[in-house]
């Protein structure tokens, strides 16, 4: 029978190996030898009866290891808060919090979250909003801005509002490729822009406009600055947050490709823990998102 008591140092070793990608790096973080890290992982695997780490470069957690990663991260957070509450030198060590957020939110409203969080160490991961919840499932992030309204196991969900996206391009691009309007035939030939291969916003706009998918040439530009520069240079049309598109539309650098827009619901998912830090970050995120559209989003109570 498996002993239900899990060893803290073994969980810490698992978390360090997966976060840093190797046993050597984990050993350096934990101030032990690589063989000691290996032994801790082996002992934990023997205890639970399953392989927890895929020993590749970089190392990654198996499906069985993911719940233990989440446990390790949550245990470390609660331990840090308990030590801080006790006071003394231990309270001087700031807690590290990992958050996943999409680039468009970071470029528009999320930076306001940083105000008043100087007592924590933030590890912000930029992820597409349709995929950021993956880091919650893997136990990497304690919170994520996501389009997923169904709670990840062990998490609460808070609706934030809707981010409005507009299809825009440079005026010369529209004159060259869309002179007769944003028709299905023109959309099939006019290059579009996408953040990466996970970015489905342009596909959503096309389906909304024509009620079907249309294959088209696409440039992939995975930074906010690069995406904007590509649109200004006339490489393609793309979906921009209304806030980012407002100034270029006002000065004539951008024009609307069509009158259709997309409202993308965003949610804040975070660990379901009685944690002052999580509560404070959640309140800060919700306040920062107060400028998002709220009219069309379905209301739901936090999970």
Swiss-Prot record:
Keywords per UniProt: Activator, DNA-binding, Repressor, Transcription, Transcription regulation
Entry-linked InterPro entries: ArgP (IPR017685), LTTR (IPR050176), LysR_subst-bd (IPR005119), Tscrpt_reg_HTH_LysR (IPR000847), WH-like_DNA-bd_sf (IPR036388), WH_DNA-bd_sf (IPR036390)
Highest taxon of source: Bacteria
Practical use: A wide array of epitopes was recognized on Rv1985c in TB patients. Those epitopes could specifically discriminate TB infection from BCG vaccination. These results indicate that the peptide pools selected from Rv1985c have the potential to diagnose TB infection by a method that may be routinely used in clinical laboratories.
Domain HTH lysR-type, first and last residues per copy: 6-62
An example Gene Ontology molecular-function term: DNA-binding transcription factor activity
Factors inducing expression: Negatively autoregulated.
Start-end of DNA-binding region: 23-42
One BP annotation, GO: regulation of DNA-templated transcription
Cited function: Positively regulates the expression of the exporter LysE and represses its own expression. Activity requires the presence of a coinducer, lysine or histidine. Acts by binding to lysG-lysE promoter region. Also up-regulates the expression of ppsB, ppsC and ppsD, by binding to the upstream region of ppsB.
Assembly and interaction partners: Homodimer. Two types of dimers are identified from the crystal packing: a DBD-type dimer, where the dimer is mainly stabilized by the coiled-coil linker helices, and a RD-type dimer, where RDs contact each other in an antiparallel, side-by-side alignment.
Record family assignment: Belongs to the LysR transcriptional regulatory family.
UniProt free text on domains: Contains an N-terminal DNA binding domain (DBD) and a C-terminal regulatory domain (RD).
Entries under NCBIfam families matching the protein: argP, PRK03635.1, PRK13348.1
Protein name, per record: HTH-type transcriptional regulator LysG
Organism: Mycobacterium tuberculosis (strain ATCC 25618 / H37Rv)
Organismal lineage: Bacteria, Bacillati, Actinomycetota, Actinomycetes, Mycobacteriales
Gene from which this protein is expressed: lysG
């Amino acid at each position: 029978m498996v002993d239900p008591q899990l060893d803290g140092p073994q969980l810490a070793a698992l978390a360090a190996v997966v976060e840093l990608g190797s046993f050597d790096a984990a050993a350096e973080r934990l101030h032990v030898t690589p063989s000691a890290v290996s032994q801790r992982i082996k002992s934990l695997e023997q205890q639970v009866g399953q392989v927890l780490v895929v020993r590749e470069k970089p190392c990654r957690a198996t499906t069985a290891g993911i719940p233990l990663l989440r446990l390790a991260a949550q245990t470390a957070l609660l331990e840090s808060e308990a030590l801080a509450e006790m006071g003394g030198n231990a309270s001087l060590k700031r807690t590290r919090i990992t958050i996943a957020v999409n680039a468009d939110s970071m470029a528009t409203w999320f930076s306001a979250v940083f105000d008043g969080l100087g007592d924590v160490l933030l590890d912000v991961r930029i992820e597409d909003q349709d995929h950021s919840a993956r880091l919650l499932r893997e136990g990497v992030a304690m919170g994520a801005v996501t389009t997923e309204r169904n709670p990840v196991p062990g998490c609460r969900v808070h609706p934030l509002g809707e981010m409005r996206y507009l299809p825009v391009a440079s005026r010369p691009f529209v004159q060259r490729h869309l002179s007769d309007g944003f028709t299905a035939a023109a959309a099939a030939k006019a290059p579009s822009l996408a953040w990466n291969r996970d970015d489905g916003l342009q596909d959503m706009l096309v389906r909304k406009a024509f009620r079907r998918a249309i294959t088209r040439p696409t440039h992939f530009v995975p930074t906010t600055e690069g995406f904007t520069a590509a649109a200004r240079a006339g490489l393609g049309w793309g979906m921009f947050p209304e806030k980012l598109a407002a100034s270029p539309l006002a000065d004539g650098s951008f024009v609307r490709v069509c009158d259709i827009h997309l409202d993308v619901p965003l949610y804040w998912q975070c660990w379901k823990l009685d944690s002052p830090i999580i509560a404070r970050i959640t309140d800060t995120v919700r306040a920062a998102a107060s400028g998002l559209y709220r009219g069309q989003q379905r209301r739901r109570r936090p999970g």
